UniProtKB/Swiss-Prot annotation:
Residues 1-18 form the signal peptide. Residues 21-246 form the Peptidase S1 domain. This is Granzyme G. The active site is at H65, D109, S204. This enzyme is probably necessary for target cell lysis in cell-mediated immune responses. It is found in: Cytolytic granule. It comes from Mus musculus. Its main location: other.
Amino acid sequence: MPPILILLTLLLPLRAGAEEIIGGHEVKPHSRPYMAFIKSVDIEGKKKYCGGFLVQDDFVLTAAHCRNRSMTVTLGAHNIKAKEETQQIIPVAKAIPHPAFNRKHGTNDIMLLKLESKAKRTKAVRPLKLPRPNARVKPGDVCSVAGWGKTSINATKASARLREAQLIIQEDEECKKLWYTYSKTTQICAGDPKKVQAPYEGESGGPLVCDNLAYGVVSYGINRTITPGVFTKVVHFLPWISTNMKLL
């Protein structure tokens, strides 16, 4: 089995884009049909990229710190630099960050993107199911994160193909030791504190998938040598997600 390597957007994610993913392995093309590649432009006119995932035909879930201008979502992609017949590129009609999102502390880091048109469901494009309100993950559970980005710390270019890595759910105390703002109520701690392999600038907004359900959203970390990282806990925000998808 290949080693579990860095895949997350976790180094300074609230001030950076999602250009880098370290390690992991390339997945079978279109085997993660819920994955979304989000393009946008920041206030300085620079292109920014984030991950996300389809939760309904016209809604994508991502991280609130990914909010920018001129946002578009690409669904059904494996190679984001190729013009694949499976790809569906849809502009974002409205970005809905959580009203209590705190950029400085990285709390309530979750956002819904209302698409201008509904995605067409195909083998390469399908929503990812959300967990039930009483569902929980526990320390030791193995989950996965996927995204596009660099395959090594020294790489100068990002991988165009979708990659994935496995992470282990950690005790909340592991993240609380690193970040005083960490909340076990609204966040999940995942990685492997025994390995210098996880947090690094990469795919913000992508899903933490456990048992084929979206339990978390990639939020933040500390640097390229410290793990674990922090994920927004989807279960806590289910009422907010449901309410906003019904309103629009």
